[in-house]
Amino acid sequence: RDRYIGGESGSVIKNKDNISVRFAFCFPDTYDIGMSHLGMKILYSLINQRADYWCERVFAPGIDFEKLMRENRIPLYALESLDPLSEFDFIGFTMQYELSYTNVLNMLDLAGIPILSKDRDDKLTNIIVAGGPCVCNPEPLADFIDLFILGEGEEVNLELMDLYKKMKSKDFGKKDFLRRAAEIDGIYVPSLYKVYYNDDGTVKEIIPQDNVRPIIKKRIITVSYTHLRAHETTLHL
């Protein structure tokens, strides 16, 4: 039951009318595997401590349930609200192992969201994010992901959501948001860099575009959990 309709003890339910930013935390594997991941629980808790932010969980369906979803045209949805992924501001994937890469693409397709980032429109919604250990090499997924979080996500997730909240209220587009997001430490936006490859497929050179930073340092948490609980960034647009 929990695998597909939620309702577990400890899940966070909020009133959508009071929410400024919605984050779909996607684990690109089945519920049973994803719910054993401690990192998801930590980030889920941190985001949901903010009254106007709502983090919900999304998992890859089993083969049998995916077949039923496609046959009945049911889009991929979050467990807490049962709302389709296409209604979320952020769609964030945690990349724990390379074998889950194809699940990311399948989940986007099941949600009715264009797989390639270049095929999505410039509306400030459905920001596709990826983080976790595998994004130390983001290039295999660079054509599909809007931005990568390099390093630890406890602080940077909230910084991104704070920026999004400010820019959404001023009617900015997705390209504007990604350009500003690239100024945050630990954020890599593939569309703002040109990557050249050697004949053997290895990276030859990465050239930043539009005067973005040439070197991105991964985020490392150096503050206490108490500070993170109270975290809120101040932004000036």
Where are the language model's segments positioned?
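Short N-terminal or domain-adjacent regulatory/targeting segments
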Residues: 1-18, 71-77
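Residues that mark the start of a beta-strand
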Residues: 20-24
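Residue-level signal for short, function-critical loop segments
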Residues: 27-31, 97
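Low-complexity, highly charged intrinsically disordered N-terminal segments
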Residues: 35, 39-42
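Short helix-loop-beta junction
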Residues: 42-53
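Glycine-rich beta-alpha loop elements in corrinoid/cobalamin-binding modules
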Residues: 60-210
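Conserved small/polar residues in nucleotide/adenosyl-binding loops
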Residues: 226-233
